[in-house]
Amino acid sequence: MLINENADNYDRETSQYIVAYLDLLGVADRIGRDEGYQKIAMNKLHNLYTFSMKLASEIAIEEYRDIQFKIFSDNIVIAKKLSEQSDKRLLDIKCLLNCVSHFQCLSVGDGVGWLVRGGITVGELFLDEIMVWGKALLKAYNLECRVAIYPRIVIDREIIPEIITNKELSEYVLQDFDNEYFLNYLCIQHFGGQILMNGFTIMQDELNGKFTESIYQKLCWHMNYVNKELDKKNEKRDKKYRLKLK
């Protein structure tokens, strides 16, 4: 006899979603610090989540209203159900990529100053107010913890052809030195040099000069990515802002 089968129809099913699984790096270490620091870190995290969700809900495009969030401590799932119509499907993908880009911009900027790693894929998912389940979640999680390595959000190779053949979507994708594709979140940001530079200062101040080799690699990757994107944008107001290691 199945649990609660008299009251439940057992008719929930997975659907096609585009899914991002994100990990905010260093949160476990922040939890282990003194009470005053913990309080600031906890409130930063809470406001990062609530502001991102509020921003997604307020964007005056219907497709953004269906973006779903599932949060557990320093991990977040952002998902969007995909339409079966090809033109709407591409718009769904764009909405998700844009939403995740906003989240990452907020996280690395001077309002928070934390690095993000993650994975994005398309596949079967079930998501409601109680739980999240499906192969897409597992794939996105594996991309984050086994492939991403650096503070980047890796995009599943299986969906790359669909993205890079669309002019608008292709702006959200870059290929890295190891041939992995990742989210070019700064494609949505303009005149953000000072915000990014100040965010990088926060990251380094938080570490107080105590870098492990792994942390150093992550900081260098982030610094190089941001500086390259600022160089490409070549915006006059941002020419004096570049990230530097202390």
Locations of the language-model features?
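Catalytic NTP-binding/metal-coordinating core of nucleotidyl cyclase/transferase enzymes
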Residues: 2-102, 111
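Intrinsically disordered, glycine/charged-rich C-terminal tails and inter-domain linkers
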Residues: 2-9, 149-246
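Short, solvent-exposed loop/turn segments at secondary-structure junctions
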Residues: 27, 125, 160
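A short acidic (Asp/Glu
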Residues: 30-33, 81, 128-138, 164-166
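Catalytic strand-loop-helix junctions within cyclic-nucleotide turnover domains
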Residues: 82-89, 119-131
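Catalytic-core segments of nucleotide cyclases and related cyclic-nucleotide turnover enzymes
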Residues: 89-97, 127-144
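Catalytic/regulatory signature loops of cyclic-dinucleotide turnover enzymes
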Residues: 109-113, 117-118, 122, 139-159
